[in-house]
Protein backbone atom coordinates (compact mmCIF):
# COMPACT_ATOMS: atom_id res chain seq x y z
CA UNK A 1 0.00 0.00 0.00
CA UNK A 2 1.23 3.49 -0.88
CA UNK A 3 0.34 6.58 1.10
CA UNK A 4 0.11 9.72 -1.00
CA UNK A 5 1.26 13.09 0.33
CA UNK A 6 -1.86 14.73 -1.13
CA UNK A 7 -4.99 13.72 -3.02
CA UNK A 8 -6.20 16.54 -5.21
CA UNK A 9 -8.61 15.71 -7.98
CA UNK A 10 -12.00 16.74 -9.31
CA UNK A 11 -13.14 13.23 -8.31
CA UNK A 12 -13.50 14.29 -4.70
CA UNK A 13 -15.49 11.15 -3.81
CA UNK A 14 -12.34 9.06 -4.20
CA UNK A 15 -9.71 11.63 -3.23
CA UNK A 16 -8.02 9.77 -0.41
CA UNK A 17 -4.36 9.67 0.55
CA UNK A 18 -4.60 6.17 2.01
CA UNK A 19 -7.05 3.34 1.22
CA UNK A 20 -9.42 2.53 4.06
CA UNK A 21 -8.49 -0.37 6.35
CA UNK A 22 -11.80 -2.15 5.74
CA UNK A 23 -11.89 -1.70 1.96
CA UNK A 24 -8.24 -2.39 1.15
CA UNK A 25 -8.36 -6.19 1.83
CA UNK A 26 -11.25 -6.55 -0.66
CA UNK A 27 -9.42 -4.53 -3.27
CA UNK A 28 -6.24 -6.52 -2.70
CA UNK A 29 -8.13 -9.80 -3.13
CA UNK A 30 -10.40 -8.89 -6.08
CA UNK A 31 -8.69 -6.22 -8.19
CA UNK A 32 -6.16 -7.42 -10.74
CA UNK A 33 -5.16 -4.03 -12.14
CA UNK A 34 -5.33 -0.39 -11.14
CA UNK A 35 -5.12 2.65 -13.38
CA UNK A 36 -4.10 6.20 -12.65
CA UNK A 37 -6.33 8.71 -14.44
CA UNK A 38 -5.94 12.44 -14.58
CA UNK A 39 -8.65 15.06 -14.33
CA UNK A 40 -8.63 15.80 -18.06
CA UNK A 41 -9.72 12.20 -18.70
CA UNK A 42 -12.62 12.68 -16.30
CA UNK A 43 -13.64 15.87 -18.11
CA UNK A 44 -13.69 13.94 -21.40
CA UNK A 45 -15.74 11.14 -19.81
CA UNK A 46 -18.18 13.67 -18.33
CA UNK A 47 -18.77 15.30 -21.71
CA UNK A 48 -19.15 11.91 -23.45
CA UNK A 49 -21.71 10.65 -20.94
CA UNK A 50 -23.60 13.93 -20.95
CA UNK A 51 -23.72 14.30 -24.75
CA UNK A 52 -24.21 10.69 -25.77
CA UNK A 53 -26.39 9.39 -22.94
CA UNK A 54 -27.94 12.59 -21.53
CA UNK A 55 -26.83 11.65 -18.02
CA UNK A 56 -25.16 13.64 -15.27
CA UNK A 57 -22.70 11.54 -13.30
CA UNK A 58 -20.38 12.91 -10.65
CA UNK A 59 -16.65 12.76 -11.29
CA UNK A 60 -15.84 9.78 -9.07
CA UNK A 61 -18.68 7.86 -10.71
CA UNK A 62 -17.13 8.50 -14.14
CA UNK A 63 -13.92 6.62 -13.37
CA UNK A 64 -15.13 3.41 -15.11
CA UNK A 65 -15.88 5.33 -18.33
CA UNK A 66 -12.52 7.12 -18.25
CA UNK A 67 -10.74 3.83 -17.53
CA UNK A 68 -12.30 2.11 -20.56
CA UNK A 69 -10.10 4.18 -22.85
CA UNK A 70 -7.08 2.38 -21.40
CA UNK A 71 -8.49 -1.13 -21.74
CA UNK A 72 -8.78 -3.31 -24.84
CA UNK A 73 -12.52 -3.96 -24.83
CA UNK A 74 -13.25 -4.13 -28.56
CA UNK A 75 -15.58 -6.99 -29.40
CA UNK A 76 -16.31 -7.67 -25.73
CA UNK A 77 -19.43 -7.06 -23.69
CA UNK A 78 -18.51 -4.58 -20.98
CA UNK A 79 -20.66 -3.04 -18.29
CA UNK A 80 -19.52 0.16 -16.61
CA UNK A 81 -21.32 0.99 -13.41
CA UNK A 82 -21.98 4.72 -13.24
CA UNK A 83 -22.98 6.13 -9.91
CA UNK A 84 -23.59 9.43 -8.23
CA UNK A 85 -25.19 12.58 -9.47
CA UNK A 86 -24.03 14.79 -6.64
CA UNK A 87 -22.80 17.71 -8.70
CA UNK A 88 -23.61 21.38 -8.41
CA UNK A 89 -24.48 23.43 -11.48
CA UNK A 90 -21.31 25.55 -11.32
CA UNK A 91 -19.09 22.46 -11.37
CA UNK A 92 -21.15 21.00 -14.20
CA UNK A 93 -20.84 24.21 -16.20
CA UNK A 94 -17.08 24.27 -15.65
CA UNK A 95 -16.69 20.67 -16.82
CA UNK A 96 -18.72 21.33 -19.97
CA UNK A 97 -16.72 24.49 -20.72
CA UNK A 98 -13.34 22.80 -20.23
CA UNK A 99 -14.43 19.77 -22.25
CA UNK A 100 -15.58 21.88 -25.19
CA UNK A 101 -12.35 23.89 -25.13
CA UNK A 102 -10.24 20.69 -25.05
CA UNK A 103 -12.16 19.34 -28.05
CA UNK A 104 -11.69 22.53 -30.06
CA UNK A 105 -15.41 23.23 -30.03
CA UNK A 106 -14.91 26.56 -28.29
CA UNK A 107 -11.88 28.74 -28.93
CA UNK A 108 -10.80 32.36 -28.84
CA UNK A 109 -8.61 34.24 -31.26
CA UNK A 110 -7.25 37.78 -31.37
CA UNK A 111 -6.53 39.85 -34.44
CA UNK A 112 -5.38 43.43 -35.03
CA UNK A 113 -7.70 45.34 -37.35
CA UNK A 114 -7.35 48.71 -39.04
CA UNK A 115 -9.52 51.23 -37.19
CA UNK A 116 -11.83 51.99 -40.06
CA UNK A 117 -15.41 51.12 -41.01
CA UNK A 118 -15.81 47.70 -42.60
CA UNK A 119 -12.90 45.93 -40.88
CA UNK A 120 -15.14 44.11 -38.43
CA UNK A 121 -17.57 43.25 -41.23
CA UNK A 122 -14.76 41.62 -43.24
CA UNK A 123 -13.91 39.32 -40.32
CA UNK A 124 -17.60 38.55 -39.70
CA UNK A 125 -18.06 37.55 -43.34
CA UNK A 126 -15.11 35.14 -43.17
CA UNK A 127 -16.49 33.60 -39.98
CA UNK A 128 -19.96 33.23 -41.51
CA UNK A 129 -18.57 31.70 -44.72
CA UNK A 130 -16.76 29.09 -42.59
CA UNK A 131 -19.70 28.35 -40.25
CA UNK A 132 -18.05 29.89 -37.20
CA UNK A 133 -20.67 30.69 -34.57
CA UNK A 134 -19.77 33.75 -32.48
CA UNK A 135 -20.21 33.36 -28.72
CA UNK A 136 -18.46 36.56 -27.67
CA UNK A 137 -16.88 39.45 -29.49
CA UNK A 138 -14.74 42.23 -28.01
CA UNK A 139 -13.70 45.15 -30.22
CA UNK A 140 -11.21 47.16 -28.15
CA UNK A 141 -10.03 50.51 -29.50
CA UNK A 142 -8.02 51.24 -26.37
CA UNK A 143 -5.60 48.32 -26.34
CA UNK A 144 -3.10 50.27 -28.47
CA UNK A 145 -1.78 53.67 -27.38
CA UNK A 146 -2.00 54.93 -30.95
CA UNK A 147 -5.44 54.20 -32.38
CA UNK A 148 -4.04 54.77 -35.85
CA UNK A 149 -2.08 51.52 -35.46
CA UNK A 150 -5.31 49.55 -35.20
CA UNK A 151 -7.74 47.99 -32.79
CA UNK A 152 -7.77 44.57 -31.21
CA UNK A 153 -10.61 42.18 -31.93
CA UNK A 154 -11.07 39.13 -29.71
CA UNK A 155 -13.63 36.59 -30.78
CA UNK A 156 -14.78 33.46 -28.97
CA UNK A 157 -16.33 30.98 -31.38
CA UNK A 158 -18.14 27.71 -31.37
CA UNK A 159 -16.66 25.22 -33.87
CA UNK A 160 -17.17 21.56 -34.74
CA UNK A 161 -13.72 20.53 -33.47
CA UNK A 162 -10.00 21.10 -33.99
CA UNK A 163 -10.11 20.68 -37.78
CA UNK A 164 -12.92 23.22 -38.12
CA UNK A 165 -11.09 25.59 -35.78
CA UNK A 166 -7.98 25.41 -37.97
CA UNK A 167 -10.10 25.92 -41.09
CA UNK A 168 -11.49 29.17 -39.64
CA UNK A 169 -8.08 30.47 -38.53
CA UNK A 170 -6.53 29.60 -41.90
CA UNK A 171 -9.38 31.34 -43.76
CA UNK A 172 -8.72 34.51 -41.75
CA UNK A 173 -4.99 34.30 -42.42
CA UNK A 174 -5.59 33.71 -46.14
CA UNK A 175 -7.42 37.05 -46.23
CA UNK A 176 -4.51 38.85 -44.58
CA UNK A 177 -5.68 38.79 -40.96
CA UNK A 178 -3.02 37.66 -38.49
CA UNK A 179 -5.35 35.62 -36.26
CA UNK A 180 -3.71 34.22 -33.12
CA UNK A 181 -5.43 31.71 -30.86
CA UNK A 182 -5.56 32.96 -27.26
CA UNK A 183 -6.52 31.54 -23.90
CA UNK A 184 -10.20 30.63 -23.92
CA UNK A 185 -10.39 29.82 -20.20
CA UNK A 186 -11.80 33.24 -19.36
CA UNK A 187 -14.31 33.54 -22.19
CA UNK A 188 -17.20 34.13 -19.78
CA UNK A 189 -15.53 37.24 -18.33
Where are the regions that the model predicts?
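Fold-independent oxyanion-binding glycine-rich loops
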Residues: 14, 18-19, 37-40, 45, ...
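A conserved regulatory-domain signal marking ACT and ACT-like small-molecule sensing domains
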Residues: 89-189
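Catalytic cores of large soluble enzymes that bind and process phosphate-bearing ligands
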Residues: 2, 15, 19, 34-41, ...
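Active-site-adjacent helical/loop segments in soluble small-molecule enzymes
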Residues: 20-76
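A generic structural signal for well-ordered coil/turn residues at beta-strand boundaries
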Residues: 10, 30, 51, 59, ...
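Alpha-helix capping/termination and helix-coil
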Residues: 18, 50-53, 72, 86, ...
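Glycine-rich phosphate/pyrophosphate-binding loop at beta-loop-alpha junctions
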Residues: 1-29, 66-114, 124
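Short, hinge-like loop/turn segments at secondary-structure boundaries
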Residues: 1-4, 53-55, 98, 153-155
Amino acid sequence: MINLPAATTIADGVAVKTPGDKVFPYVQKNVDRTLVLDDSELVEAFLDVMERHKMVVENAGLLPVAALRHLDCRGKNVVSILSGGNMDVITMSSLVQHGLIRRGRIFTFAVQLPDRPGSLLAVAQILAANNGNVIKLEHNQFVNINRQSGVELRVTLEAFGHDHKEQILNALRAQGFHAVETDTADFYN
